[in-house]
Amino acid sequence: MSQFTLLGFIALGGAFGACSRYLISELCVVLLGRGFPYGTLTVNVIGSLLMGILMSSLNQGLIEAGPWRPIIGLGFLGALTTFSTFSMDNVILMQHGEFIKAGLNILLNVALSITACFIGYQLMMKS
């Protein structure tokens, strides 16, 4: 596959990831409200779980590396997850004096995302 074609597939993965992020974030607002950045937390945890599954699958030889790692890992998951929005969510919470919520958001994003990535990786390990 040419580099130009690969870039096109990465961009397509990014488009699907960005649309998925938007839809998941909007669903979280509908279901859980705007009192906490649930959407950002949700996409970061889901993305981490999927990254663990992807990397374990690649390392185990369950899927061929080929273009899938950059298409899914960089394109789709790169657009689905978000560190900049996570950072801004915390700045806004702190500006409003919501330091406990900001701390909880930081703790949950880091702990749950790493745990989800570990679980996803372990799920794909060969027995």
Swiss-Prot record:
Membrane-spanning segments: 4-24, 35-55, 71-91, 99-119
Entry keyword set: Cell inner membrane, Cell membrane, Ion channel, Ion transport, Membrane, Metal-binding, Sodium, Transmembrane, Transmembrane helix, Transport
Gene Ontology biological-process annotations: cellular detoxification of fluoride
Principal location listed in the UniProt entry: membrane
Subcellular location(s) of the protein: Cell inner membrane
Main function: Fluoride-specific ion channel. Important for reducing fluoride concentration in the cell, thus reducing its toxicity.
Name of the protein this chain belongs to: Fluoride-specific ion channel FluC
Provenance organism: Photobacterium profundum (strain SS9)
Protein's gene: fluC
